[in-house]
Amino acid sequence: MITGVFSMRLWTPVGVLTSLAYCLHQRRVALAELQEADGRRPVDRSLLKSKMVQVVFRHGARSPRKPLPLEEQVEWNPQLLEVPPQTQFDYTVTNLAGGPKPYSPYDAQYCETTLKGGMFAGQLTKVGMQQMFALGERLRKNYVEDIPFLSPTFSPQEVFIRSTNIFRNLESTRCLLAGLFQCQKEGPIIIHTDEADSEVLYPNYQSCWSLRQRTRGRRQTASLQPGISEDLKKVKDRMGIDSSDKVDFFILLDNMAAEQAHNLPSCPMLKRFAQMIEQRAVDTSLYILPKEDRESLQMAVGPLLHILESNLLKAMDSATAPDKIRKLYLYAAHDVTLIPLLMTLGIFDHKWPPFAVDLTMELYQHLESKEWFVQLYYHGKEQVPRGCPDGLCPLDMFLNAMSVYTLSPEKYHALCSQTQVMEVGNGE
């Protein structure tokens, strides 16, 4: 968990997107009239051609971001940082414009916390690297072996990679690519990232003033809410954590998940209350960023939705130059990205996103009707997005559902800079 300069050339102009969406809608209306005449038939999937895959994923297992204030501390041995040989894959990190890698304030912050045993906080471990390699192998099976969509060797003409500028995410991406392409490449691997103050691959409470203001009260009072407050007191009392210590369900879950992933001995009470801790962490997150607060959700993930939407529309536009589109788009994000993203798509399962989880968006075109479809998978399981009749969703219906939360860079900056903001649900 974590609490571009927008390169305008990387964003499709709003007017173009609107025109493309309108044309797509008109084409679907005409097709619907034909289908209505003879009765709508199920889509023949054998006539669907893969056009694009977009994957938003969480990094692999890591050390906790902040240790619990317990007398007996879990030991985080630096041997856990050993790099599995099969995950070795050279890469370069640039900013969005192709310039030098930006400074990472988060990594600097993590290096200020040394855990018992010698590891720094928030570091990707060997376990996490193996998880990401396994995710890459699953993607290889899906898009190289089962369906020959991607080349078996990495090619920068086929793959675009974007990550937050945090080392565990960059390294997770390396391991995923190693699994996906078995360490074979034709051309350099470039991972694009952004400055922390303009990053949109997580809800940016630091730079989006309105988002920070709208949620500030809820963040301060979340642990005081009925049910959450009583359960937090119970867990802290049983674990011997003083009531004055600033430990919430996020910190408890963070340590619990990290210890479980590495099979490390932990406080028995942490194991006993594992289910409650996860559920209350989810409840806390939904209190801070509720589904009823549309504008906050827009500011949290609206720009990322816009990026995903832009890629879809560029792919179906015959006027798009071949060098402006990729077959695969990879986005290395975080749990705090995935929760609101899944909420906006109507597929959040009220479970905390685990390490190395992925949200995969596939784009298809029907070979005969030329109609476009989107298919979503979360954690490898087919999903039915909000506003869609089933898993295989007509693209215009999917875009219409996304439009409720999608924000162009201009609208994002306008919303974030609002000077008067009314907090929603503060303490209620």
Swiss-Prot record:
Keyword Hydrolase: yes
GO process terms (BP): lysobisphosphatidic acid metabolic process
GO CC field: mitochondrion
Active site: 59 (nucleophile), 335 (proton donor)
Localization (cell): Mitochondrion
Positions of the UniProt region annotated as Substrate binding: 58-168
Leading EC class: hydrolase
Enzyme Commission number(s): 3.1.3.2
Chief site of localization: mitochondrion
SUPFAM superfamilies: Phosphoglycerate mutase-like
Reaction equation(s) it catalyzes: a phosphate monoester + H2O = an alcohol + phosphate; 1-(9Z-octadecenoyl)-sn-glycero-3-phosphate + H2O = 1-(9Z-octadecenoyl)-sn-glycerol + phosphate
Transit peptide: first to last position: 1-32
GO molecular function, one term: acid phosphatase activity
Gene3D superfamilies according to UniProt: Phosphoglycerate mutase-like
Keywords tagged on the record: Hydrolase, Lipid metabolism, Mitochondrion, Phospholipid metabolism, Transit peptide
Domain of life according to the entry: Eukaryota
Family: Belongs to the histidine acid phosphatase family.
Function text: Hydrolyzes lysophosphatidic acid (LPA) containing a medium length fatty acid chain to the corresponding monoacylglycerol. Has highest activity with lysophosphatidic acid containing myristate (C14:0), monounsaturated oleate (C18:1) or palmitate (C16:0), and lower activity with C18:0 and C6:0 lysophosphatidic acid.
SUBUNIT field: Monomer.
Protein name per Swiss-Prot or TrEMBL: Lysophosphatidic acid phosphatase type 6
Gene encoding the protein: ACP6
